[in-house]
């Protein structure tokens, strides 16, 4: 059977949660493969609204959910999120949720370092969520990380603590912070271990067995391609690779397992925090998009910056991530605009670009080249078929397809999961 990998094709917050929930009903397994609890998903199921930041979206429907080895895992946040969802009536047990034994832990001093660095950066802030994601990935790459499997071997942790504390104590001294309290840390780990360990499994084995059995696997990406550590607007990016190729390394399945790569894009563009944003609207039009789209971050609550759809960036995202088709979300937010613009290129120092230059100073200085399309007055909210869309909305969708060189597979017209127009089924064999 076909697998599907869902990724954001902009700067995150594209509406992946709803699309993953819509697909998860037919998936046998849902997998998170990168990131941490720094990116949120909002799911609306009936009269219930669920806000997730670490758990795979499939857990809400009881689908087997997996947190892969590519995720940096905060055990205390995990416990809180599980408790919150259980309070909303969601069943979460080791029977329907597994955590990779090799996932690195986010520890309290990672959060400390994240905040200390951001505060010391002044105008150079990159907009971190201060949740310790970056420092935890640094320790993983530096071979200092304490991992989920270490919670079962707390008596054998001294050498690892020597390595990780030597590194962090030196950094903390530079901020006039005291050394890590090793005994307190061991006590914290001992306290949380009993809650975490029942969920710890060799998830690569679970996933390979599922694949051999012909079960549908849905890979759920976090953030978006434009926040990818290699392919995003560096340094205003996250600390992991967010492209679809990461689904393999972050879960323990081979690269052919990704299947249909579904890129999620808003019908306009948003960004949270600092960094270049060529099509940003810092005027009444941008404010109108933000108000109509309720653009506030799920995790941080920060107001999102808004702008017109940037076809250049989405085309770039589709290329580097091998996107098979896109899901266009929040089409209804554009209802009632007399004119709608699409960014089709950039100008910089007299030169025209059909891609975003790599240097941050150039990215900040490019001027967008726009194509203007007539808007529509008829509401698209709640539409579930092409027949319910106004002709100009269909024209807009078709023009987006042409410019990003990628077909639209789904169109979302409201937060409700059923308000979705299916053009091509990603799970079709």
UniProtKB/Swiss-Prot annotation:
SUPFAM superfamilies: P-loop containing nucleoside triphosphate hydrolases. The active site is at residues 13, 41. GTP binds at residues 12-18, 40-42, 304, 330-332, 412-414. Pfam families: Adenylsucc_synt. It is found in: Cytoplasm. GO terms for molecular function: adenylosuccinate synthase activity; GTP binding; magnesium ion binding. Keywords: Cytoplasm, GTP-binding, Ligase, Magnesium, Metal-binding, Nucleotide-binding, Purine biosynthesis. SMART domains: Adenylsucc_synt. Pathway: Purine metabolism; AMP biosynthesis via de novo pathway; AMP from IMP: step 1/2. Substrate binds at residues 298-304. GO terms for cellular component: cytoplasm. Its EC number is 6.3.4.4. It catalyses: IMP + L-aspartate + GTP = N(6)-(1,2-dicarboxyethyl)-AMP + GDP + phosphate + 2 H(+). Its cofactor is Mg(2+). Mg(2+) binds at residues 13, 40. It comes from the Bacteria. PANTHER family: ADENYLOSUCCINATE SYNTHETASE. This is Adenylosuccinate synthetase. It comes from Rhizorhabdus wittichii (strain DSM 6014 / CCUG 31198 / JCM 15750 / NBRC 105917 / EY 4224 / RW1). The gene is purA.
């Amino acid at each position: 059977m076909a697998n599907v990998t869902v990724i954001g094709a902009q700067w995150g917050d594209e509406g992946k949660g709803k699309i993953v929930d819509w697909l998860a009903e037919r998936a046998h397994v849902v997998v998170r493969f990168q990131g941490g609890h720094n990116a949120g998903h909002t799911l609306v199921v009936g009269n219930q609204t669920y806000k997730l930041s670490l758990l795979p979206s499939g857990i809400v429907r009881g689908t087997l959910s997996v947190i892969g080895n590519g995720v940096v895992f905060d055990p205390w946040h995990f416990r809180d999120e599980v408790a919150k969802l259980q309070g909303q009536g969601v069943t979460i047990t080791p029977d329907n949720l597994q955590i990779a034994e090799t996932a690195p832990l986010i520890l309290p001093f990672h959060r400390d370092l994240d905040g200390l660095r951001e505060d010391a950066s002044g105008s150079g802030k990159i907009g971190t969520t201060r949740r310790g994601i970056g420092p935890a990935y640094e320790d993983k790459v530096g071979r200092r990380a304490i991992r989920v499997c270490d919670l079962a071997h707390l008596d054998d942790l001294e050498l690892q603590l020597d390595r990780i504390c030597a590194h962090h104590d030196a950094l903390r001294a530079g901020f006039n912070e005291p050394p890590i309290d090793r005994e307190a840390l061991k006590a914290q780990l001992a306290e949380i271990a009993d809650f975490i360990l029942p969920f710890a499994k060799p998830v690569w084995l679970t996933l390979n067995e599922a694949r051999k059995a012909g079960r549908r696997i849905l890979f759920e990406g976090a953030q978006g391609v434009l926040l990818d550590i290699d392919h995003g607007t560096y340094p205003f990016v996250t600390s992991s690779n967010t492209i679809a190729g990461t689904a393999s390394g972050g879960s323990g399945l081979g690269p052919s397992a990704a299947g249909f790569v579904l890129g999620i894009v808003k019908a306009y563009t948003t960004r949270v925090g600092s960094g270049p944003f060529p099509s940003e609207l810092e005027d009444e039009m941008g404010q109108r998009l933000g108000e109509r789209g309720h653009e506030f971050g799920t995790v941080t609550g920060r107001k999102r910056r808004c702008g017109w759809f940037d076809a250049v960036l989405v085309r770039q995202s589709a290329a580097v991530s091998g996107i098979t088709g896109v899901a266009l979300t929040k089409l209804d937010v554009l209802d009632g605009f007399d004119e709608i613009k699409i960014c089709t290129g950039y100008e910089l120092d007299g030169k025209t670009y059909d891609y975003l230059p790599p240097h941050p100073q150039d990215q900040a200085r490019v001027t967008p080249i726009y194509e203007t399309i007539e808007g529509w007055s008829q509401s698209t909210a709640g539409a579930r078929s092409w027949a319910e869309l106004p002709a100009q909305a269909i024209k807009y969708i078709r023009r987006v397809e042409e410019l990003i060189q990628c077909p639209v597979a789904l169109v979302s017209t409201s937060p409700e999961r059923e308000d979705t127009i299916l053009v091509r089924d990603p799970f079709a064999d």
